[in-house]
Amino acid sequence: MATYKVKVATGTDFFSGTLDSISLTIVGTQGESHKQRLNHFGRDFATGAVDDYTVQCQQDLGELIIIRLHKEPHSFLAKDPWYCNYVQICAPDCRVYHFPAYQWMDGYETLALREATGKITADDTLPILLEHRQEEIRAKKDFYHWRVFVPGLPNYVDIPSYHPPPRRCRNPNRPEWDGYIPGFPILINIKATRFLNSNLRFSFVKTASFFYRLGPMALAFKLRGLVDRKRSWKRLKDIKNIFPATKSVVSEYVAEHWTEDSFFGYQYLNGINPGLIRRCTQIPDKFPVTDEMVAPFLGEGTCLQAELERGNIYLADYRILDGIPTVELNGQQQHHCAPMCLLHFGPDGNMMPIAIQLSQTPGPDCPIFLPNDSEWDWLLAKTWVRYAEFYSHEAVAHLLESHLIGEAFCLALLRNLPMCHPLYKLLIPHTRYNVQINSIGRALLLNKGGLSARAMSLGLEGFAQVMVRGLSELTYKSLCIPNDFVERGVQDLPGYYFRDDSLAVWYAMERYVTEIITYYYPNDAAVEGDPELQCWVQEIFKECLLGRESSGFPTCLRTIPELIEYVTMVMYTCSARHAAVNSGQLEYTSWMPNFPSSMRNPPMQTKGLTTLQTYMDTLPDVKTTCIVLLVLWTLCREPDDRRPLGHFPDIHFVEEGPRRSIEAFRQNLNQISHNIRQRNKCLTLPYYYLDPVLIENSISI
């Protein structure tokens, strides 16, 4: 007789335990055990429990390679889902085998788990292991399907349990509730939350935290009448009362300094859309700025051409917004423009706007606004640029380049890499909750009753069109942060804390990824010969980039350096990139004139006519303002059940080498966090959005 000591760990989230019957089959290189029920006196498989069992076998099974967990009915009790963390088995020779699960078993089913050692296809020689990894991929591809979201955008998850089961009620003609309460500011897709596959949706704690925070705030907005007022704001200072209890050093600074040119320019470097600005070496023909116009703002002893040659002129071009139609909001037609803004980096270290044009087409009805124009002309011109920032940020930098692309990375990973693959183990922590938050996001933003339709001047179709244009211009190099800074010509720009912090995090990730990949891939041939890896890369190119060759995305990877860069890009996109554009949203937008989602008057065609009243009448009305800010408030408040970058409580790697690499990664991140906090002590306006302590492992909000 051979005795195997078994530990079974149940998840710690609420309702992770089960009352169903759980049995175990152990498979080794020398045989297979009988199915044996795991049962002892008292409660089995309670939430958070680690249960110990003894399994007797007729013979030694040799090296353990696979186990099967069988979930079956228990007596007359109803079906009860179970979340299994892992199974650990101590063999008769005292060798301990680890079998990671970290997934739900909802129904009566059998789950086969491999021993935790990471292996690429070439490492598997036993037919049973090759068959297992092939069957796992087949099952995932049968379950997870691609679905077209909007033509021209990355495809997304379409799984059977996304849709609710058939309705069972006496009156089939009664309309179903769509998750929207008339009069309230937002729509929540309850179905997407409730019926999403268990392994993709929020934990109970995160779900409860999300709705517990959102519900009372939405109710407060309703009771205060903020979402029913379709009129203009009477006074600018009234905007501060929207969130009287939600203040920070940054939000207070924004409200006090939003009119200053230096702060306007600062936001291009360290605001919530810091990846747009480019060094300008030649003034575009469509933006006919002359030396005579801007000479007073460049300082003595220089001129526009000299500053261009020195690399001190920068351009923010919102051409991606050109020609998109607007909609009516609250009975009033909204207006739109695609501005260009020229900036100068001066010897005092300030990035200053020196010229703004509110169109991509110059002409007599499109004046170039300058800092020495009237106070309200210049302020309104800057506000139009900030309006364009809203769409550049929300549609492209935030929703497209982090959420939607991250979801495509996630789905391709689930469909093409088995759990034993080292890249699956490396990247699965960075996919946590991405599908769930995107399901909610599609209901909040991209829905006929959502934010884009009810509070954005471009409406649902226009907002989607901006994203489609964004994807058509997206390149592989732009997602690889070091290349992006060089390509935009900002690699040596002083005071660019976003660049400094993002590079620090990128290189820490790159070092970690390098150690993991070189542990499992001995040479370039192993990379090129890994069919699962190549299918993953090809599917991302096809379903995320829609097969667009001009994107520069690889369709295959042939060398270890190529694989390292690619995996680092995926990891960064699904964590730090999102943190940089998401975490500061409320701080920079709670003062609405700094980030308006709509404009109620057309862009100025003549100078000298703007007044305080016309400025107020151009800004979004009270209702539109509050709908947008409520949604952004929700997106900036990470619900409970957080996992900061480098925090990997789920044990996927068991080998000593990768475990050391994980610990070294954590230490590097801790040092980066320390450096950021020390630097911020000397700054009037701290930049902390890329502090690793504040970065989530995944896109989970």
Curated annotation (Swiss-Prot):
SUPFAM superfamilies: Lipase/lipooxygenase domain (PLAT/LH2 domain) (SSF49723), Lipoxigenase (SSF48484)
InterPro entries registered for this protein in UniProt: LipOase, LipOase_C, LipOase_C_sf, LipOase_CS, LipOase_Fe_BS, LipOase_mml, PLAT/LH2_dom, PLAT/LH2_dom_sf
Any single GO CC term annotated in Swiss-Prot or TrEMBL for this entry: perinuclear region of cytoplasm
Lineage start: Eukaryota, Metazoa, Chordata, Craniata, Vertebrata
Sequence positions that bind Fe cation: 398, 403, 578, 582, 701
Effect of residue 441 to A: Reduced enzymatic activity and changed stereoselectivity of the oxygenation reaction
UniProt catalytic activity: 1-O-methyl-(5Z,8Z,11Z,14Z)-eicosatetraenoate + O2 = 1-O-methyl (5Z,8Z,10E,12R,14Z)-hydroperoxyiecosatetraenoate; 1-O-methyl-(5Z,8Z,11Z,14Z)-eicosatetraenoate + O2 = 1-O-methyl-8-hydroperoxy-(5Z,9E,11Z,14Z)-eicosatetraenoate; (5Z,8Z,11Z,14Z)-eicosatetraenoate + O2 = (12R)-hydroperoxy-(5Z,8Z,10E,14Z)-eicosatetraenoate; N-[omega-(9Z,12Z)-octadecadienoyloxy]acyl-beta-D-glucosyl-(1<->1)-octadecasphing-4E-enine + O2 = N-[omega-(9R)-hydroperoxy-(10E,12Z)-octadecadienoyloxy]acyl-beta-D-glucosyl-(1<->1)-octadecasphing-4E-enine
Family from the record: Belongs to the lipoxygenase family.
GO molecular function, a single term: iron ion binding
Consequence recorded when altering residue 441 to V: Loss of enzymatic activity
Compartment(s) of residence: Cytoplasm; Cytoplasm, Perinuclear region
Note: Mummy, a recessive ethylnitrosurea-induced mutant has a nonsense mutation in the catalytic domain of Lox12b, resulting in truncation of the protein by 68 amino acids. The affected mice are born with red, shiny skin that desiccates and appears scaly. They probably die of dehydration like mice with targeted disruption of the gene.
Protein name, UniProt field: Arachidonate 12-lipoxygenase, 12R-type
Keyword Hydrolase annotated: no
Pathway(s) of this molecule: Lipid metabolism; hydroperoxy eicosatetraenoic acid biosynthesis; Lipid metabolism; sphingolipid metabolism
Cofactor(s) it depends on: Fe cation
Keywords, alphabetical: Cytoplasm, Dioxygenase, Fatty acid metabolism, Iron, Lipid metabolism, Metal-binding, Oxidoreductase
EC number per UniProt: 1.13.11.-
Gene Ontology BP, a term: linoleic acid metabolic process
PANTHER family found in the cross-reference section: LIPOXYGENASE
Regulation: Increased by calcium.
Superkingdom of origin: Eukaryota
Gene expressing this chain: Alox12b
Summary of the function given for this chain in its UniProt record: Catalyzes the regio and stereo-specific incorporation of a single molecule of dioxygen into free and esterified polyunsaturated fatty acids generating lipid hydroperoxides that can be further reduced to the corresponding hydroxy species. Does not convert arachidonic acid to (12R)-hydroperoxyeicosatetraenoic acid/(12R)-HPETE. In the skin, acts upstream of ALOXE3 on the lineolate moiety of esterified omega-hydroxyacyl-sphingosine (EOS) ceramides to produce an epoxy-ketone derivative, a crucial step in the conjugation of omega-hydroxyceramide to membrane proteins.
